[in-house]
Amino acid sequence: MVNDLETTKLQGKHILVLSSVYPLTPDGNHGAFVRETILRLQPTGAKFTVFAPAYEASKSYTLEGVHIYRFRYCLKRFENLVRDGAPTKLQRQPLNLIPATLYVILGTVQLFWLCLRKRPDLLHVQWPFPHGVMAMPAAKLLGIPMVLSCHGGELLLAKKFGFVASFLRWFLPMAKGITANSSFTQGLINKLYDGPVEVIPYGLTIEAKPAIPRQEGEVPKILFVGRLDERKGVRYLLEALPIILAKQPVRLRIVGKGILEEELKAQCQELGLESVIDFLGFVTKEELAQEYASCDVFVLPSIVDSKGDTEGLGIVMIEALAHAKPVVATPVGGIPDVIIPDQTGLLVPEKNPNALAKAVLELLANPERAAELGRNGLSDVQSRFSWERIILLWQKVFVKAVD
């Protein structure tokens, strides 16, 4: 759904989106929320270009009516900085600071050149740090207005590094519009900037499937979906599994990859869990929907990690709720924006395997309660996280910026 009045005002406007992530194919999940937002806004008549980093020398191309300009910033083998979490890679391997520096410098030059040639009407900057550094020359010298979208990570960096906070305090007031993916992220912005911030959550990027019932003799499935890094708290879910297995046979399905994958597999071996855990890696959207449809409980055990980073929103919970699945999660970051405790899911303390196990066992022992949470979650997602609502919010932000 689009607003006809706002559609008229966006007709023919060229919006250039600067993002570290964008799917390489329509079926890709890496940056799927950026792609889905753009596709949903195309009926407004606006033209979109995406400026995103190359992944191992990937070329620029046009996909679904959107030109994706892939900028080169390093040798092919090192062009994977933004895959699986740049902050974690920088923390674990300081030498990654070299491609990170080149990313900003070469990205700035190429973005300015692209803006000089294309003259967009608006720059939509995802993650204002570091992308605000890259967008600023084009915005200031060419007079292009900006909308800035914060996702949480850049603001948690600001808490840790004074120079990031100083930059954002100076940079945020330059924008014609600022958005946050959750009230948690909005709160972090408000510590640096006292102007208006529009909360616009992510919407569903996969098509929900009907529930797939268990086959005779099949044990209940617990599902986790996400990047395998510290802030996702998967190690605590693995520690909870022996407690669950002592009372109930289950199978854990883990979708996603990340820098901690080998450590987590080693933890599985130490706990003797190899036979009941499946590491599925990256999957297609069709396969992901299949996993949601066939699971009994979805668990997101996120934590505030050692860097102070945590969950900005948690789109995977929205996907699980869209499949009417009961969710067990932790009350960190933007998760409470999605889960209403004891109505659409269960929230337990972070870093607490016993609490995770207790919540999962409660749902498996009470299928009627689990089904009720799933139904409530589906209804809530259809209301608060519908694309109709989300796109109207984006239209208002963009129209105000280009007016």
Feature-to-residue mapping (PLM):
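Conserved acidic donor-binding segment of nucleotide-sugar-dependent glycosyltransferases
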Residues: 341-342, 346-353, 362-368
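Acidic anion/phosphate-binding donor-loop and adjacent secondary structure
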Residues: 77-78, 158-159, 187, 203-219
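Short alpha-helical donor nucleotide-sugar binding micro-motif in glycosyltransferases
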Residues: 282-283, 290-295
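Short hydrophobic beta-strand element within catalytic cores of glycosyltransferases
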Residues: 317, 322, 326-329, 339
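N-terminal subdomain of nucleotide-sugar transferases
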Residues: 1-72
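Donor nucleotide-sugar binding/catalytic pocket of nucleotide-sugar-dependent glycosyltransferases
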Residues: 49-52, 69-70, 148, 165-210, ...
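Acidic donor-binding loop of glycosyltransferase active sites
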Residues: 293-308, 325
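A conserved nucleotide-sugar
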Residues: 116, 225-228, 234-279, 286-287, ...
